[in-house]
Amino acid sequence: MKFAVIQFPGSNCDLDMLHAIRDSLGEEAEYIWHAETSLAGFDAVLLPGGFSYGDYLRTGAIAKFSSIMPEVLRFAEMGKPVLGVCNGFQILTEIGLLPGALIRNNNLHFICKTVPLRVANASTMFTELYEEGEIIQVPVAHGEGNYYCDDETLLKLKENNQIVFTYDSVNPNGSRADIAGIVNERGNVLGMMPHPERAVEEIIGGTDGLRLFESVVKAWKEEQVNA
């Protein structure tokens, strides 16, 4: 399986993502610069964390207009896996692949620590190797990770089982309904604020994030067999 790691000016978690895929997962991964216009030959797209375009205007607002984004939209429309982590999640809301928005943390401070997450939906292509309700430990590192949506959107997310991860015990940023990660209605686009790529090795704190990437590979292999 081959992953595309999209790089924007200001991305700073792209190396972590590449390392997680190549060295921990054992799959292929390549950087794709934001000015490129093709994702031919790739099976999954990863939008890493960081501060794309310096977070000017607002997080993800300028990245929305990058040359690669129409291809990311087309990729998602084809049903292929798209994962946005932290700034990547913010970008996914800006381009309309996911509902809602990410706003300033309610304490107005940058948060960097490992937090407990509850797996709220273990039936997606990103979570099938987790148990429903399982508590995992994954790092967060953000200043604008407070997920917000209106009441109608929140009701729809709940009814469609689109809430994939929630903060357990303590909500670090004020997100509505403790939301840490959501998928689109089709289930092939996941946005999350915590960093699974930073939880793939025991030596640096645990491997709870690795199963997310392993789930994607498993789903992809099953699709190839059934194609």
Curated annotation (Swiss-Prot):
Q: Which keywords does UniProt give here?
A: ATP-binding, Cytoplasm, Glutamine amidotransferase, Hydrolase, Ligase, Nucleotide-binding, Purine biosynthesis
Catalyzed chemical reaction(s): N(2)-formyl-N(1)-(5-phospho-beta-D-ribosyl)glycinamide + L-glutamine + ATP + H2O = 2-formamido-N(1)-(5-O-phospho-beta-D-ribosyl)acetamidine + L-glutamate + ADP + phosphate + H(+); L-glutamine + H2O = L-glutamate + NH4(+)
Query: Which CDD domains did the record assign?
Result: GATase1_FGAR_AT
One Pfam family per UniProt: GATase_5
Give yes or no: UniProt keyword Cytoplasm.
Answer: yes
Query: What does the entry list under GO cellular component?
Result: cytoplasm
Entry's InterPro entries?
Class_I_gatase-like (IPR029062), PRibForGlyAmidine_synth_PurQ (IPR010075)
Q: Where in the cell is it found?
A: Cytoplasm
Biological process per Gene Ontology, one example term = 'de novo' IMP biosynthetic process
Q: Which residues form the active site?
A: 86, 195, 197
Subunit composition and interactions: Part of the FGAM synthase complex composed of 1 PurL, 1 PurQ and 2 PurS subunits.
Q: What does this protein do?
A: Part of the phosphoribosylformylglycinamidine synthase complex involved in the purines biosynthetic pathway. Catalyzes the ATP-dependent conversion of formylglycinamide ribonucleotide (FGAR) and glutamine to yield formylglycinamidine ribonucleotide (FGAM) and glutamate. The FGAM synthase complex is composed of three subunits. PurQ produces an ammonia molecule by converting glutamine to glutamate. PurL transfers the ammonia molecule to FGAR to form FGAM in an ATP-dependent manner.
Which protein, by its recorded name, is this? Phosphoribosylformylglycinamidine synthase subunit PurQ
Native species: Listeria monocytogenes serovar 1/2a (strain ATCC BAA-679 / EGD-e)
